[in-house]
Structures are given as structure tokens and as C-alpha cells.
């Protein structure tokens, strides 16, 4: 299975996309045109930053991806994020990796930031478990409700 197929398992699922595209799943063409270039760029840059595929250790089952990228808004900050297939929600994977990513970024001397729609209580809880603290509420132009920024 190719990378676009794996990503389509996430982006083609309305439940996974609920707090990203207001629940509108992406088509395979949209995955190839919009999602893949961003992910492939992180591999081509060959840095410690990017969006990285996540697999279960015991089975090599693809479960989603994790983000560890230089933040575009705050200098010397790293944004963390995650997108998991819904059958892997609630297993602690997002929290486990978020904690590791926070520790890695802090060792690099960076501030860690994460963002989520205010209704995305599961992601907000992951941020809190990873030690991030509420910083502010803000609005993206395309959003129907506010987002929140957490920092550590």
C-alpha cells in the first residue's frame, strides 16, 4: 500500500476529519494534491522536523501520523500534532507520542505549541497530559468556531 493510500485512510474518514475540515472527508485526488506534498516535503528536507508516519511496534499496522514541525507563528517554537485512524483513538498513543515530542523539543531548547478546535476535547486532553498549558483562544478565517493554542 502506498503513502497516499495510507493517508487516504485518515483523510477520507469523516470522523477523523471532524475537527480539521468540519467533517468533510477528502477525496483521493485531494489527498494527492493537498496532503501528500506537505508530508513529502518534510521527508525531502531531511531535518529532524516534519510529519512522520506512525506504526504499531508489534504489528507494523499504520495508525496515523505525528507532527513535529517548526511553528510558523512563533519563533523558536515547535508545533506538535497528530492524526490517528479512529480505531486507535482512546488507546493512549497520541498522549504517549506527544509527551516524547515535547521532551525532544524542550531538549532542543524550543517552546512547544499545539492547536485544536475548541470542541476537540480529546486533543485538548492530550495536550494537557503532555504538559501543555492553555495560552489563548483564536479564530482561523475558515473556522466556524474558535481554536485554542496550548504551549509548554
Predicted regions mapped to residue ranges:
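A short linear-motif detector with a strong N-terminal bias
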Residues: 30-34, 47, 92, 128-131
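Conserved GNAT-fold acetyl-CoA-binding loop/helix
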Residues: 15-39, 48-50
Amino acid at each position: 500500500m502506498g503513502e497516499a493510500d495510507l493517508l487516504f485512510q485518515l483523510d477520507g474518514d469523516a470522523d477523523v476529519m471532524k475537527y480539521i475540515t468540519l467533517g468533510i472527508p477528502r477525496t483521493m485526488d485531494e489527498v494527492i494534491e493537498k496532503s501528500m506534498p506537505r508530508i513529502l516535503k518534510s521527508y525531502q528536507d531531511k531535518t529532524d522536523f516534519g510529519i512522520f508516519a506512525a506504526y504499531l511496534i508489534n504489528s507494523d499496522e499504520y495508525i496515523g501520523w505525528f507532527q513535529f514541525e517548526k511553528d510558523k507563528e512563533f519563533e523558536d517554537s515547535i508545533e506538535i500534532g497528530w492524526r490517528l485512524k479512529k480505531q486507535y483513538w482512546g488507546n493512549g498513543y497520541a498522549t504517549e507520542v506527544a509527551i516524547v515530542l515535547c521532551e525532544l523539543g524542550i531538549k532542543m531548547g524550543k517552546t512547544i505549541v499545539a492547536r485544536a478546535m475548541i470542541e476537540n476535547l480529546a486533543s485538548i486532553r492530550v495536550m494537557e497530559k503532555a504538559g501543555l498549558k492553555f495560552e489563548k483562544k483564536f479564530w482561523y478565517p475558515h473556522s466556524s468556531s474558535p481554536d485554542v493554542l496550548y504551549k509548554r
